[in-house]
């Protein structure tokens, strides 16, 4: 109940705004930069704390000035905060930062408000102009649904050039030049409901102070103009048209005279003098000849501070009314018309951009100012005023000067009524507090309207003074009251007092909604926080006889007593009773009792005795003087304390249930046969094994007693009914454990506990909610103690028999809300084992009560022969029974699925990537019902991805067990899931979800190429071509085509296989991953082609759902989306497949001088990367021979590279091991297929393949490949050359004596031909001569006898045979 200062907002990154406005401060922080350069842009990284710790103690040391400058930077800025706390402006010179409000979750789970930089930049449009003042004005909404509430906030900025510009979040709305001098100050006044009928209603206005003039803009005109400009800016941004003329603006302009300098001003508003004051003023100025009118004139009052006079009072007549004095009227009558409301001229062009592009050279026309002389002032030639702050009710004003004084002015009388000294560079503001009628105490024997709770509320004003030199914030009671609060806040803060609220309200809209606006706040740059000052109303009433002050003293004394380190047990309780009984005010007494009950240092008996004593004292008083609210509060707390005592006693009693418990008893209790009970036990045992985790448990946690303080926080009495507050899940578990945990273990009497709770007034529904929260959260302990099921059955039966648990009018053909509450708790629980057990217990109790009710009903009737049949049919037709059966099936399915998802492979194959090590979320029936038809398969697919199971293993797990396959528990669980979900986990559906899951995870980390490879493997396992085609098409469009096109353009640009850096930059993966990616794309396109061929032969599958999950809702499944896909256009997919093969071959073999797109004409290029289901114009007819030649050269390169990679002797074993998935591809065969699509002769490719095989010494493979060649004569000529190269190498490079002799015996023709051969073209020169002889004979077979080289071949045979004998 004392004055306080509370933080209500913080800054997300204030240091970045400081660095933007003060770049030199950022450069002067070498210490912070050396510590961690990456953390210099965030105030959250302890940079402020580091500076505070290193602050020099002696002011003479170096660095103290630098630190002060870094912390006091806010004093040099223009600062403004919107009254609705949604926008803040920090400006300096030509720059400004607009900070917007954001909400984030704090450490305690509550939302915290923060200011973050929403826009920053330069706001100056003319050269050399600086920001001098700024305002954030919230504008009221005009919508019916939000009348009176803030719609948006306008930022008004004044400049040294005289311009006033209006912004909204960085967008310039309009700009106005009203005077050529610089803007000194901007102030705003919004509408306030008059407190008394005689008070003049003030209009809204924006006042702009210049060195010798003051301009006031009418609030209604400004409001309409800003709304129109904002709408036009939005239209201009949408249409691109910026040539829109802003609407006109009405204003008044007064030239202030007879004053030297003006620093600040206050616009008091319209005032009317009383007849006495009117005559007094006329007599003092005009003498006895002064004439006055019958009705006093209305005048606008302005107060300025500066020098000569120190404070000046100006009065401007409103409308055409006569001035107060005749000669004054003569002086201003000729000029009065110029100050009437007129349309503002000279609007500048505005734009919907952050900055203006150009500034118009021509200055707008200036309206002349109407002279306004100072009527009187406070003359003080040595004193210079610095600021003036008007009170909320316009009766007082606080003025600061250069002498360190704060002067309090009476605005109406124009006199100084109080002065404070010792406040140099002070910042002031006001707080207006309205009295709370509920805190009033009736006055004894008085007839004051403020002596009862029905009178009008009083209003108190407090002056807030911030002295930055001393770092202190003080709150003073006005006018002559004492200081009521003082706080040490630091020396670098800024005190913000806007003095206005929301613009655009009137006497009707201002009453529809009370805006949440602050009156005054303190911005602390050191702690990066915004704090509000709270002052209770009663501080305005404090005097020597104040009972309130005495009560506050007693409350402080009580707080100190509760915080005492070593309280005296003997007198502690007595002192507390005396203190609380001495307090007079009921509200303060209630506050004291709340602090006592919230203390965790007092024993339960002390709390009970203190509360009981206060209760007895109140009952002994007279009824008229007793506060009913306090009496009810004490009674409710006593009831809660008695309930706490009774529950604690029941939990401490030595109670043990001697009833034996067996499996047969459990089966009878749950109404299950032996087979069903065994199945339930087996499921729970598997679930328990898979969900076992190594956790540390403390014995005191289970038996920990709920503190009485926490107990009182959780419960409350409302209208004589005990209810549970809105608390979190953990709090519900704690409260439920306090009530039921001992009962569930058989250590406390269940009947007595239920009776105590029911007698206290807790409803059965709340007790059921607590019971289930405990049961479902303590799953591990419950599964270890099966006897707790019996205790739950007993507890649930007792709760169900309470009076308001089950409605007596409930019909079996309708759903019981009682049982529906229990079912909903089981549906939402993620602990499937505990939920399944509780559902069995609930089903059993519901059936028991239903049978009992049926027996009771039929016992009152005459039974006939069919009575038993009627009873059976009654139970069978119960709607709740059907819902229980459905829930049991769903929970059993969820339990099996949960067991599977938490099972782990042992041992782990290898270190799993981070994506595969992420834990899977726990399941609940609700999640499965909201997950759509594919939710179950999607969950299993995530588990398969996490375990990295092969598609073959999924197929094996779906088969029946046989002797050959070993029993593996993980496969057993998967097989059990298949049996439980025959529709949701159908193999095609599961493979489709696995395929999608792998490609989604690959997209998160493209470097994991094996994820995409595994995705394609699952895609190939899908049997239905409709599903296969749809999944492939979705994968291509969603994840692959963008990267595929990027890879194509990159390879075409560089003309070879790109390096790793380029691949990462353009495609987002390494060169190795890109190679694998292209191979996977090729397999996907080929799979799509195969699926399209068999589409017409297979029907579209019908997707079924298990009976228990027919009510599933949620997103459409992957398989359903796949079936909605259109059929592919086969030629277009084939066209992409050709391109993919080219790219894959180029990357696989690192081919150079290859531009993939150069192999296609314009039609072929235009068809790439289009929708695979669309019909595109593809190349047809004869191709240009130049294209064919380039294609043929590429295919020959591929064949050569493939043969070399396969048969080269200098292979890299590590690279070969890393690229094992590339060896399966038949590259020569693929080259032949490509030759068919590229219109290249496939026989040329086959002949080249045979030649490459023989060149590498693979003669056996070459002999097999010869059979596929069509033109064997040309092949024989090519092989003859290769034979000559082998012989030339053997004869000329060995140069043995026998070889030279043989060479001399050869025919001259053959010798000349061998010398012309180049053996360097051979890839393998170590081929045995016998293999070469065999090759010559093969050439002889292929060459016809009439061939020109036939005789040469005969000579070769002789030469080879001769060499074989050497």
UniProtKB/Swiss-Prot annotation:
Keywords: Cytoplasm, Endoplasmic reticulum, GTPase activation, Phosphoprotein. Residues 43-63 have a biased composition (Acidic residues). Transmembrane segments: none annotated. One of its GO terms (molecular function) is GTPase activator activity. The modification Phosphothreonine is found at residue 899. It is found in: Cytoplasm; Endoplasmic reticulum. InterPro entries: Rab3GAP2 (IPR026059), RAB3GAP2_C (IPR029257), RAB3GAP_N (IPR032839). The modification Phosphoserine is found at residues 38, 448, 914. It comes from the Eukaryota. Residues 30-69 are annotated as: Disordered. GO terms for biological process: positive regulation of autophagosome assembly; positive regulation of protein lipidation; regulation of GTPase activity. Belongs to the Rab3-GAP regulatory subunit family. Regulatory subunit of the Rab3 GTPase-activating (Rab3GAP) complex composed of RAB3GAP1 and RAB3GAP2, which has GTPase-activating protein (GAP) activity towards various Rab3 subfamily members (RAB3A, RAB3B, RAB3C and RAB3D), RAB5A and RAB43, and guanine nucleotide exchange factor (GEF) activity towards RAB18. As part of the Rab3GAP complex, acts as a GAP for Rab3 proteins by converting active RAB3-GTP to the inactive form RAB3-GDP. Rab3 proteins are involved in regulated exocytosis of neurotransmitters and hormones. This is Rab3 GTPase-activating protein non-catalytic subunit. The gene is Rab3gap2.
């Amino acid at each position: 109940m004392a004055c306080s200062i509370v933080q209500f907002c913080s800054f997300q990154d204030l240091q970045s705004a400081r660095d933007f406005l003060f770049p030199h401060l950022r450069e002067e922080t070498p210490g912070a930069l050396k510590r961690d350069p990456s953390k210099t842009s965030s105030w959250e990284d302890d940079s402020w704390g580091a500076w505070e710790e290193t602050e020099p103690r002696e002011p003479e040391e170096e660095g103290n000035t630098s630190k002060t400058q870094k912390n006091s930077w806010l004093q040099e800025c223009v600062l403004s905060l919107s009254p609705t706390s949604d926008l803040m402006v920090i400006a300096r010179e030509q720059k400004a930062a607009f900070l917007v409000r954001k909400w984030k979750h704090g450490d305690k789970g509550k939302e915290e408000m923060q200011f973050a930089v929403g826009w920053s930049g330069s706001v100056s449009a003319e050269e050399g102009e600086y920001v001098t003042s700024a305002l954030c004005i919230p504008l009221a909404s005009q919508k019916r649904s939000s009348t009176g509430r803030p719609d948006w906030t306008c930022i008004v900025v004044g400049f040294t050039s005289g311009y006033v510009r209006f912004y909204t979040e960085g967008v310039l709305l309009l700009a106005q030049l009203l005077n050529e001098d610089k803007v000194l100050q901007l102030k705003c006044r919004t509408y306030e409901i008059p407190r008394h009928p005689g008070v003049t209603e003030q209009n809204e206005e924006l006042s702009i102070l210049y060195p010798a003039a003051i301009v006031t803009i009418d609030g209604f005109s400004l409001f309409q103009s800003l709304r129109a400009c904002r709408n036009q800016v939005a239209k201009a941004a949408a249409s691109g048209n910026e040539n829109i003329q802003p609407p006109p603006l009405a204003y008044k302009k007064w030239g202030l005279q007879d004053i030297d300098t003006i620093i600040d001003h206050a616009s008091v508003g319209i005032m009317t003098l009383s007849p006495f004051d009117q005559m007094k003023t006329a007599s003092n100025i005009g003498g006895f000849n002064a004439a006055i009118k019958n009705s006093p004139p209305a005048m606008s009052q302005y107060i300025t501070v500066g020098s000569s006079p120190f404070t000046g009072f100006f009065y401007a007549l409103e409308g055409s009314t006569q001035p107060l004095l005749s000669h004054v009227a003569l002086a201003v009558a000729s000029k009065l018309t110029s100050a009437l409301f007129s349309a503002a001229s000279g609007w500048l062009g505005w734009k919907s951009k952050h900055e203006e592009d150009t500034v118009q050279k021509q200055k707008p026309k200036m309206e002349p100012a109407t002279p306004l002389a100072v009527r009187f002032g406070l003359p003080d030639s040595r004193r210079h005023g610095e600021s003036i702050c008007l009170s909320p009710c316009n009766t007082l004003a606080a003025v600061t000067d250069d002498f360190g004084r704060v002067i309090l002015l009476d605005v109406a009388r124009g006199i100084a009524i109080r002065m404070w000294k010792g406040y140099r560079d002070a910042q002031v503001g006001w707080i207006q507090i309205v009295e709370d009628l509920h805190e009033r105490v009736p006055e004894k024997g008085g007839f004051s309207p403020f002596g009862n709770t029905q009178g009008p509320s009083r209003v108190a004003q407090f002056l807030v003074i911030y002295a930055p030199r001393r770092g202190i914030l003080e709150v003073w009671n006005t006018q002559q009251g004492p200081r009521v609060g003082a706080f040490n806040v630091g020396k670098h803060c800024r005190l913000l007092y806007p003095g206005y609220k929301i613009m655009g309200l009137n006497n009707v809209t201002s009453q529809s909604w009370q805006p949440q606006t602050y009156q005054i706040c303190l911005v602390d740059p050191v702690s990066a926080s915004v704090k509000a000052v709270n002052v209770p109303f009663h501080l305005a009433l404090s005097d020597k006889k104040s009972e309130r002050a005495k009560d506050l003293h007693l409350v402080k004394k009580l707080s100190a007593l509760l915080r005492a380190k070593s309280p005296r047990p003997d007198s502690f309780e007595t002192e507390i009773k005396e203190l609380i009984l001495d307090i007079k005010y009921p509200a303060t007494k209630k506050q004291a009792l709340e602090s006592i009950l919230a203390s965790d240092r007092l024993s339960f008996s002390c709390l009970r005795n203190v509360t009981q004593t206060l209760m007895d004292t109140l009952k002994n008083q007279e009824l008229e003087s007793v506060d009913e609210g306090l009496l009810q509060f004490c009674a409710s707390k006593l009831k809660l304390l008695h309930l706490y005592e009774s529950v604690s006693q029941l939990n401490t009693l030595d109670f043990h249930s001697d009833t034996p418990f067996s499996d047969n008893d459990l089966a009878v209790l749950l109404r299950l046969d032996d087979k069903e009970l065994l199945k339930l036990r087996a499921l729970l045992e598997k679930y328990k094994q898979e969900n076992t985790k190594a956790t540390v448990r403390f014995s005191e946690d289970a038996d920990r007693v709920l503190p009485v303080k926490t107990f009182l926080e959780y419960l409350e009495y409302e209208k004589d009914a005990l209810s549970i507050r809105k608390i979190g899940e953990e709090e519900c578990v704690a409260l439920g454990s306090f009530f039921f945990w001992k009962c569930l273990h058989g250590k406390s009497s269940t009947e007595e506990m239920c009776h105590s709770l029911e007698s206290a007034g807790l409803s059965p529904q709340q007790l059921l909610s607590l019971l289930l929260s405990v049961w479902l959260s303590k799953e591990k302990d419950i599964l270890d103690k099966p006897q707790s099921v019996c205790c739950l059955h007993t507890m649930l039966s007792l709760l169900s028999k309470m009076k308001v648990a089950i409605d007596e009018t409930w019909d079996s053909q309708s759903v019981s809300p009682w049982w529906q509450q229990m079912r909903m708790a089981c549906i939402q629980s993620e602990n499937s084992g505990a939920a399944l057990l509780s559902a069995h217990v609930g089903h059993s109790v519901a059936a028991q009560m239903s049978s009992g009710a049926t027996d009771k009903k039929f016992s009152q009737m005459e039974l006939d022969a069919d009575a038993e049949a009627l009873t059976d049919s009654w139970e069978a037709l119960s709607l709740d029974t059907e819902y229980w059966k459905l829930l049991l099936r769903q929970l059993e399915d969820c339990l099996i699925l949960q067991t599977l998802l938490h099972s782990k492979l042992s041992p782990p194959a290898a270190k799993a990537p981070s994506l595969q090590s992420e834990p899977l979320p726990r399941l609940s029936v609700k999640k499965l019902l909201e997950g759509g038809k594919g939710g179950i398969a999607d969950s299993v697919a995530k588990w398969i991805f996490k375990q990295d199971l092969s598609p073959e293993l999924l197929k094996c797990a779906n088969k029946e067990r046989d002797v050959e396959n070993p029993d593996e528990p993980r496969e057993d669980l998967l097989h059990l899931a298949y049996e439980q979900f025959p529709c949701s986990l159908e193999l095609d559906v599961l493979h489709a979800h696995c395929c999608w899951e792998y490609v989604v995870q690959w997209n998160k980390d493209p470097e994991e190429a094996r994820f995409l490879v595994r995705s394609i493997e699952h895609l190939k396992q899908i049997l239905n071509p409709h599903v296969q085609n749809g999944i492939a098409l979705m994968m291509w469009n969603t994840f692959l085509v963008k990267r595929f096109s990027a890879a194509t353009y990159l390879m075409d640009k560089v003309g070879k296989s790109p390096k790793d850096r380029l691949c990462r930059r353009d495609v987002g993966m390494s060169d190795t991953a890109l190679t694998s990616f292209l191979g996977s794309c090729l397999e996907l396109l080929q799979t799509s082609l195969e699926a399209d061929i068999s589409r017409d032969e297979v029907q579209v599958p019908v997707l079924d759902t298990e009976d228990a999950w027919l009510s599933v809702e949620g997103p459409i499944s992957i398989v359903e989306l796949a079936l909605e896909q259109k059929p592919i256009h086969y030629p277009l997919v084939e066209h992409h497949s050709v391109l993919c093969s080219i790219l894959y071959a180029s990357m696989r073999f690192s081919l150079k001088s290859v531009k993939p797109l150069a192999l296609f004409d314009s039609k072929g290029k235009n068809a790439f990367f289009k929708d695979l289901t669309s019909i595109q114009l593809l190349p047809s007819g004869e191709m240009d021979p130049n294209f064919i030649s380039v294609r043929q050269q590429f295919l020959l390169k591929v064949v050569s590279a493939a043969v070399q990679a396969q048969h080269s002797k200098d292979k890299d074993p590590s690279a070969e091991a890393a690229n094992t998935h590339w060896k399966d591809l038949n590259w020569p065969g693929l080259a032949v297929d490509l030759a068919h699509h590229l219109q290249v002769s496939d026989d040329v490719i086959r002949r080249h393949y045979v030649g490459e095989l023989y060149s590498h010494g693979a003669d056996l493979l070459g002999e097999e490949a010869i059979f596929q060649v069509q033109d064997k004569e040309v092949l024989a000529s090519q092989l003859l050359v290769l034979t000559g190269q082998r012989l030339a190498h053997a004869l000329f490079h060995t140069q043995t004596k026998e070889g030279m002799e043989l060479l001399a015996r050869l025919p001259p023709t053959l010798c000349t031909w061998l010398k012309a051969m180049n053996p360097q073209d051979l890839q393998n020169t170590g081929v045995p001569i016998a293999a070469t002889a065999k090759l010559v004979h093969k050439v002889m077979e292929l060459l016809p006898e009439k061939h020109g080289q036939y005789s040469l071949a005969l000579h070769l045979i002789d030469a080879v045979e001769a060499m074989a004998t050497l």
